[in-house]
C-alpha cells in the first residue's frame, strides 16, 4: 500500500448556473467513490426520465436530494482521488445551508474551486453586482480559504466554441476582482474546461490546442499543469495544527451502558490523549479522559481532523452539552467569553442592524443568541480601514467592527489563534444574514467550576 495519501478538503463555489454540479459530478464519477452499481442505477433512471444524455449533474442531484432529506449518504460519494490526494468536497453551494456550513463547517476547506461559465452573457450574470460569484469568493477569503483554483467552464458553448479570446477575457476580469478581494492571481490556476464534455478535466483537451497549460507562482514553490485534476494535485498540503493548545467542540454527548459519559466531537487543534485532564468550557468542568475512540477503535492520540468519542469519569450527561469546548486544563485551557469583538460582514438583511440587535450566532458547534452591544465602526471590506465611527446602523453589504455579548455562556476564540472557533454565521429569519471573524475575546474568570475526583487523582498522581 505504501503511505496513505493526504486528505484535503475543497469547497466548490460559483454562480447558480455555472455548471458546478456537472463539473463536480464529473470528478466524482470519473475518479471517485461512486460504485458501478449506483451509477448503473442512476443511468437507468436518467434514461427512463428522458434525461438520457445522463448529465453528471444527475449524480450530484441524486446525492444532494438524499443529503437534504437527511439521509446520511455514504460520505465516500463526495470523495475522489488525484495522484497525490484524497479529496473531499465538503459542500457545494445550492445546498440550502451552504453559507452556514462553510462557516461552522466540520472542516475548513483547504482550497476553493471557483467555477465560472464562458457562455455568452452567462459569465456577466454571475459576476454582476447581484451574482453569487463575488459573494462566494469573498466568503471563502474572509473565512481563511487561502488557495483558489478557477475553472472557466462551458468552453464548448462560448462564441465561437472553445474560443481563446473569450477565455482570456474572462481570465482577465476574474483576476482583477479576486485581486480586489485579497487573492493573488499569480498564485491561482486558471483552467478552461467543459465539465460536461470533459475537456481539460482529467485529460488535456484536443479542442483547445491554444491552451498551453496553467502556471502558478508562490513562495512555497511554483507549479504548472494542463488540467483541472492537475491543479487539484498542486494544492499545497494543509498544515494540521497539532502544536496548538487542544480545542475540541462537542457535537453530542452520549451515555453508554457500562462505559459512562461519552462526549463526541472533532479535534480542531492540538492533541487529545487518554489520561489528559480536560476542562469543558464555558461550564468549567474538569475531569480525566479515560479513553479515546475513533470508528470503534481505541486511539493513543487524536489529532486535528479526527472525529472522536472519549470517555470521561464522574461527569453526567446532563452536565455537558453540544457547543461546549474541551481543552487541556493545564495548557492554555478554553474559557467562557464575557463578550467579544468581531468584524462582521452583512450579507442579506432586509432592514438595518442597530445596537441591541440579538440574532443567533452559529460558531463551531455552538448555537447561541448574542447581542450587538455596540457597533463601533464601519470598515472598508477590503482594506479594513475605518470609514465611519459609531454608525447608527449597518445594512447589507456593510462591514463593521462590533462588540457582541452572548445571552448564555459561550466559548469562542480569536480567529488568529484558533480559526475554527473564531468564525461565525449570524442567523435570523432562517437564513444567514451576516458572517463574522472574531478579533478579540474578553474571557470570564474561570474559577469555581466543578473538579471531579478523577481529575484530582490524576493531577496528584502526576506531581
From Swiss-Prot:
Q: Where is this region: G4?
A: 153-156
> Which keywords does UniProt give here?
Cytoplasm, Elongation factor, GTP-binding, Nucleotide-binding, Phosphoprotein, Protein biosynthesis
Q: Which GO terms describe its cellular component?
A: cytoplasm
Where are the stretches annotated G3?
A: 91-94
The record lists GTP as bound by 14-21, 91-95, 153-156
**Positions of the region G5?**
194-196
Q: Which domain of life is it from?
A: Eukaryota
**In the record, what terms sit under GO molecular function?**
GTP binding; GTPase activity; translation elongation factor activity
Which family does the similarity line name?
Answer: Belongs to the TRAFAC class translation factor GTPase superfamily. Classic translation factor GTPase family. EF-Tu/EF-1A subfamily.
List the Pfam families hit by this protein, alphabetically. Answer: GTP-eEF1A_C, GTP_EFTU, GTP_EFTU_D2
Which residue intervals make up region (G2)?
Answer: 70-74
Q: Does the keyword Phosphoprotein apply?
A: yes
**Principal localisation:** cytoplasm
**Protein name per its UniProtKB record:** Elongation factor 1-alpha 1
Q: Please provide the Gene Ontology terms (biological process) for this protein.
A: translation; translational elongation
Q: Which PANTHER family match?
A: TRANSLATION FACTOR
Q: Which NCBIfam families match?
A: EF-1_alpha, PRK12317.1
Q: Where is this region: G1?
A: 14-21
What is this protein's function? Answer: This protein promotes the GTP-dependent binding of aminoacyl-tRNA to the A-site of ribosomes during protein biosynthesis.
Amino acid at each position: 500500500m505504501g503511505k496513505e495519501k493526504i486528505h484535503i478538503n475543497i469547497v466548490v463555489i460559483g454562480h447558480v448556473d455555472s455548471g458546478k454540479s456537472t463539473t463536480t459530478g464529473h470528478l466524482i464519477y470519473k475518479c471517485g467513490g461512486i460504485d458501478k452499481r449506483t451509477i448503473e442505477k442512476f443511468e437507468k433512471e436518467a434514461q427512463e426520465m428522458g434525461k438520457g444524455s445522463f448529465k453528471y449533474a444527475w449524480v450530484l442531484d441524486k446525492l444532494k436530494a438524499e443529503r437534504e432529506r437527511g439521509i446520511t449518504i455514504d460520505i465516500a460519494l463526495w470523495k475522489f482521488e488525484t495522484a497525490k490526494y484524497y479529496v473531499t468536497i465538503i459542500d457545494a453551494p445550492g445546498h440550502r445551508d451552504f453559507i452556514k456550513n462553510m462557516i461552522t463547517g466540520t472542516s475548513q476547506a483547504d482550497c476553493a474551486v471557483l467555477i465560472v461559465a464562458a457562455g455568452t452573457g452567462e459569465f456577466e450574470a454571475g459576476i454582476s453586482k447581484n451574482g453569487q460569484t463575488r459573494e462566494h469568493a469573498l466568503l471563502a477569503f474572509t473565512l481563511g480559504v487561502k488557495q483558489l483554483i478557477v475553472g472557466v467552464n462551458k468552453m464548448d458553448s462560448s462564441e465561437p466554441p472553445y474560443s481563446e479570446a473569450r477565455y482570456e477575457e474572462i481570465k482577465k476580469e476574474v483576476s482583477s476582482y479576486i485581486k480586489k478581494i485579497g487573492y493573488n492571481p499569480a498564485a491561482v490556476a486558471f483552467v478552461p474546461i467543459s465539465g460536461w464534455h470533459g475537456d481539460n478535466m482529467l485529460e488535456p483537451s484536443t479542442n483547445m490546442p491554444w491552451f498551453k497549460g496553467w502556471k502558478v507562482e508562490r513562495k512555497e514553490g511554483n507549479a504548472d499543469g494542463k488540467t483541472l485534476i492537475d491543479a487539484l494535485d498542486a494544492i499545497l498540503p494543509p498544515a494540521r495544527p497539532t502544536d496548538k493548545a487542544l480545542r475540541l467542540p462537542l457535537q453530542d454527548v452520549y451515555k453508554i451502558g457500562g462505559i459512562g459519559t461519552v462526549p463526541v466531537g472533532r479535534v480542531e487543534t492540538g492533541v487529545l490523549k487518554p489520561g489528559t485532564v480536560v476542562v469543558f468550557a464555558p461550564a468549567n468542568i474538569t475531569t480525566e479522559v479515560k479513553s479515546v475512540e475513533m470508528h470503534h477503535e481505541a486511539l493513543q492520540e487524536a489529532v486535528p481532523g479526527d472525529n472522536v468519542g472519549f470517555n470521561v469519569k464522574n461527569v453526567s450527561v446532563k452536565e455537558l452539552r453540544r457547543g461546549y469546548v474541551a481543552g487541556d486544563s493545564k495548557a492554555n485551557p478554553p474559557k467562557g467569553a464575557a463578550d467579544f469583538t468581531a468584524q462582521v460582514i452583512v450579507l442579506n438583511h432586509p432592514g438595518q442592524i442597530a445596537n441591541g440587535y440579538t440574532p443567533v450566532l452559529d460558531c463551531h458547534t455552538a448555537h447561541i443568541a448574542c447581542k450587538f452591544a455596540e457597533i463601533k465602526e464601519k470598515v472598508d471590506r477590503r482594506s479594513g480601514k475605518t470609514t465611519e465611527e459609531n454608525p447608527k446602523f449597518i445594512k447589507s453589504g456593510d462591514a463593521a467592527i462590533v462588540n457582541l455579548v452572548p445571552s448564555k455562556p459561550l466559548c469562542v476564540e480569536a480567529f488568529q489563534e484558533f480559526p475554527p472557533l473564531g468564525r461565525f454565521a449570524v442567523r435570523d429569519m432562517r437564513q444567514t444574514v451576516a458572517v463574522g471573524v472574531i478579533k478579540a475575546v474578553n474571557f470570564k474568570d474561570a474559577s469555581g467550576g466543578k473538579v471531579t475526583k478523577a481529575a484530582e487523582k490524576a493531577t496528584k498522581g502526576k506531581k
